[in-house]
Amino acid sequence: DGISLFLVVLTGILFPLVIVGIDPHHNETSYFAWMLLLQAGVMGSFLALDLFLFFVMFEIVLVPMYFLIGGWGYDQRVYAATKFFLYTMAGSAFMLVGIIATVSLAQRDLGVVTFDLVRIAEGASFSTNAARWLFVSFAIAFAVKVPLFPFHTWLPDAHTQAPTGGSVILAGVLLKMGTYGFLRFGVYLFPEAAMWARPVLFTLAVIGIIYGAIAATMQRDLKRLVAYSSVAHLGFIVLGTFALTSQAVTGAVIQMVSHGVSTGALFLLVGMIYERRHTREIAELRGIQHVAPIFAGVFTVVMLSSVGLPGLNGFVGEFLILIGSFGPARWWTVVATVGVVLAALYLLWAYQRVF
């Protein structure tokens, strides 16, 4: 449907590009096997309408990503892979409890044990308190996966230490499993609880937008800067998701795909720079446009799409989110617009010094 279609297409495009276009340099057979298992898990997560199947696919993704970071990453790869695994596993434990409780409570209304998402959403009724606790159990898992502030600390380390292909997939589709989960499962199963919790989620999203932008301006590693920019961009998606207006939700879905394209491309380009310069330190990367003018032009277009320049893919989703969120989340939206300005500042600052 409209929620998962574009994410499935994005997954189907990014994985072949990464597999064909990026050389893992060693243990190619194992690398490609983990990549294909990772693709199966991501596809399954976006296609599942069964709570148990979704949980299994959500967890399957952890294993290949752990080995991709730990086996083909950089100096601190084992630390980053372990941190990613433990954070996400801890969040998923809450979702497992929530799924078991949801199915158990739904059995009273449905008369049968079922994990079917549509059947539970349309046929089961939960008390106010039960719905709130169940929503929180799902929300914790998705907040870690997005990641929302303050669950974000695993992301910069994972991105910085992951191989280029791992970073492209992590930014392009893996993080969207969290935002997709909020929309597909959290809001759909527990709409009233989502309305109850959204002031907290608005606040965390906006903090993530501002914090991610400020943290990005302080980075000296180009890849880590792009990683923190993801924290800010995903804050916009969560803001739009819980505004629950047609414009904001449409913008959130569009922004999921746009972020996957633009930030995935940024990580790919940063990886190309590292392959040739063997450093990601911004201070050591001056003057690239003099030796690679076409590459500099491509980087400029991708960077401006990440900023949200009108006419490029990053603008539409961000604009719809801000317009659609202004009514239900006026002051949060005003603060979020500051993040748009900060995004332009840190990306242009980095571009000026690198190129």
Locate each region found by the language model.
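Structural signature of hydrophobic alpha-helical transmembrane segments
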Residues: G2-T11, L51-P64, A131-V144, A194-V206, ...
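Membrane-interface helix-boundary motifs at transmembrane edges
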Residues: G21-S30, Y74-Y79, P156-A158
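Alpha-helical multi-pass transmembrane bundles of energy-transducing inner-membrane proteins
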Residues: A33-L37, G41-A130, A215-Y228, A232-I282
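Juxtamembrane/interfacial segments at transmembrane-helix boundaries in multi-pass membrane proteins
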Residues: A93-H152, D157, F182-V200, A248, ...
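Residue-level recognition of membrane-helix boundary sites in multi-pass small-molecule transporters
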Residues: S4-F6, S30, L51-F54, K83, ...
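Hydrophobic alpha-helical transmembrane segments in multi-pass integral membrane proteins
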Residues: G2-V42
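Predominantly late transmembrane helices and immediately cytosolic-facing juxtamembrane segments
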Residues: F149, T263-F267, T333-F355
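Hydrophobic residues within the alpha-helical transmembrane core of Major Facilitator Superfamily
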Residues: P16, A40, A90, F182, ...
